[in-house]
Regions:
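A conserved segment at the C-terminal end of the G1
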Residues: 100-114
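A noncatalytic interaction/capping subdomain that flanks phosphate/NTP-handling catalytic cores
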Residues: 1-95, 112-114, 121-223
Length: 223
């Protein structure tokens, strides 16, 4: 059985992608269980995607498609995907999110030893807390560290055009920024559900805005 333990879910994965196959190997379950989610790409759908994405390799197409299916499935299990970098602290973690138009990747500003989840960590509610999970999906899935999870304490949005210095955000500021950070991985019909997820999340997690990450240590001490 192609069963893997990812974000505390039993996920059945059928893939021909060499990249994804290598990334998920570390997550393989050593038990048999009914899967919570099954991820697969049919031959017909693969042909359609190849025609729609001329010049893109089959490996990249399948890896991206499976990551998208996984992201969609999170909403069925009290979770969501977010374009961010998860930064580890002593007893919890912080998500650093920056819009594409900022023109830089947060990873270039964060000391590597502090990063435990790259690009698209999964976030799920368990009991009364929220946890960020390292996953094998996405362009940097091969850097995953076998599904670790840490309690999520705050989300920091980096936007040089909006913020001058570190400050805590009110809902009117962070709601559109949060939706933008997850929008790439949600279907239109999930928008209302995503707002419901955010409504619960905001009672457990703090939101901050900052101009840049030049004073990374200071930011981590304050959020």
């Amino acid at each position: 059985m192609n069963l893997y333990r990812i974000s505390d879910l039993n996920i059945e994965i059928y893939t021909n992608s060499p990249t994804l196959t290598e990334s998920i190997e570390r997550y393989k379950a050593n038990y048999r269980e009914v899967p919570n989610v099954t991820l697969a790409l049919s031959d017909d759908r693969m042909i359609e995607l190849m025609e729609e994405n001329e010049g893109v390799t089959a490996d990249v197409i399948e890896n991206t498609y499976m990551a998208t299916l996984y992201c969609w499935s999170l909403f069925d299990f009290n979770g969501f995907p977010i374009r961010a970098t998860a930064v580890e602290r002593e007893n919890d973690c912080v998500l650093i999110a920056a819009p594409y138009e900022e023109g830089f990747d947060p990873l270039t500003m964060i000391p590597g030893e502090h990063v435990f989840a790259y690009n698209y960590p999964a976030v799920r509610r368990q009991d009364d807390d929220y946890y960020a999970f390292d996953t094998p999906f996405g362009k940097l899935g091969y850097l995953s560290k076998t599904g670790r999870k840490l309690k999520l304490s705050s989300i920091v949005f980096v936007d040089s055009g909006r913020f001058d210095s570190l400050r805590r955000l009110e809902a009117k500021d962070f709601v559109p920024m949060f939706m933008r950070a997850v929008a790439q991985n949600i279907r239109h019909e999930r928008t209302k559900h995503t707002l419901f997820v955010l409504e619960r999340l905001m009672h457990h997690v703090d939101f901050y805005g900052v101009r840049d990450l030049s004073d990374f240590g200071f930011i981590m001490e304050r959020v």
